[in-house]
């Protein structure tokens, strides 16, 4: 079983997942279309405690939630070297749906930073190519603070945060090693690397998925540049994907919920409901959120 080989958390509500449509017959209780099972893919080095704050947005509304964060060494080193180790983890993650017999539930992904996007990239590939997973039904994806294109300085900032509690000598060694590897494989040997490994950002630009996407980012983000997210939004729109994007303007990397809890939660919940009712109007495209009072 995949569950025995993956460090994940699953939260299953007592009540079945239903969309928030008040029914007179039920005294205002939730009824109607089933809400999606939500899969949270955490940012590099984030703790389950931190990810649980996002999980609560969905779980308290009756959603099954799975949260998982890929090991930081795979994110920063394996992917940089072009080693697709995360593909194995992506497959185990999808196999959890069959282990818990929830593979027929609609799925919503909530993906954080480039670490989450790197894993999500392989999820997309498996959904398209793996016979067991091709019938899974994804209804939407939320991107928080990502995806970003090659930004060595931003990646170093992210890795420094991951390593902040490590001994100083080890931290310095790993930062130098990452810098050398990234520069070698993505600058000096970029044409050679491209022959056997496509960068996750480039893969997502032309992804075959067509379900709605919500991008939550900030021009104040020093890890993932706002222009990278905006370029992704334009590319997805060009592929006729229903996209909404919100610029939080002042919040730092993966800090939008912390700085604007009410507004962030409302955006996620409204997007989730629009995805499960995709036959109706889907969320419009926005480029910024000029008024944030949450």
From Swiss-Prot:
It is found in: Nucleus outer membrane. Its main location: nucleus. It is a single-pass membrane protein. Keywords: Membrane, Nucleus, Transmembrane, Transmembrane helix. This is Transmembrane protein 53. Pfam families: DUF829. It comes from Bos taurus (Bovine). One of its GO terms (biological process) is negative regulation of osteoblast differentiation. Coiled coil: none annotated. The gene is TMEM53. GO terms for cellular component: nuclear membrane; nuclear outer membrane. Ensures normal bone formation, through the negative regulation of bone morphogenetic protein (BMP) signaling in osteoblast lineage cells by blocking cytoplasm-nucleus translocation of phosphorylated SMAD1/5/9 proteins.
């Amino acid at each position: 079983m995949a569950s025995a080989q993956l460090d994940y958390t699953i939260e299953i509500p007592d009540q079945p997942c239903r969309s928030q449509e008040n029914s007179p017959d039920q005294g205002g209780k939730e009824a109607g279309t089933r809400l999606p099972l939500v899969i949270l893919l955490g940012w590099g080095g984030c703790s389950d405690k931190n990810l649980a704050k996002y999980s609560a947005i969905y779980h308290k509304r009756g959603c099954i939630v799975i949260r998982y964060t890929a090991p930081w060494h795979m994110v920063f080193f394996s992917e940089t070297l072009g080693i697709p180790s995360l593909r194995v983890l992506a497959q185990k993650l999808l196999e959890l749906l069959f282990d818990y017999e929830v593979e027929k539930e609609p799925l919503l992904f909530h993906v954080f930073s480039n670490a989450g996007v790197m894993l999500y990239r392989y999820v997309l590939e498996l959904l398209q190519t793996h016979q067991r997973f091709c019938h899974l039904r994804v209804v939407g994806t939320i991107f928080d603070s990502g995806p970003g294109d090659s930004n060595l300085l931003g990646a170093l900032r992210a890795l420094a945060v991951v390593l902040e509690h490590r001994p100083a000598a080890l931290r310095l060694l790993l930062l130098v090693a990452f810098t050398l590897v990234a520069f070698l494989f993505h600058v000096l040997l970029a044409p050679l690397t491209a022959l056997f490994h496509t960068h996750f950002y480039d893969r997502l630009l032309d992804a075959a998925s067509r379900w709605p996407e919500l991008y939550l980012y900030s021009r104040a983000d020093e890890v993932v540049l706002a222009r990278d997210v905006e370029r992704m939004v334009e590319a997805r729109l060009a592929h006729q994907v229903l996209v909404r994007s919100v610029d939080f303007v002042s919040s730092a990397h993966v800090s939008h919920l912390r700085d604007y809890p009410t507004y962030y939660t409302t955006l996620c919940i409204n997007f989730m409901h629009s995805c499960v009712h995709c036959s109706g109007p889907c969320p419009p495209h926005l480029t910024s959120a000029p008024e944030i009072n949450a």
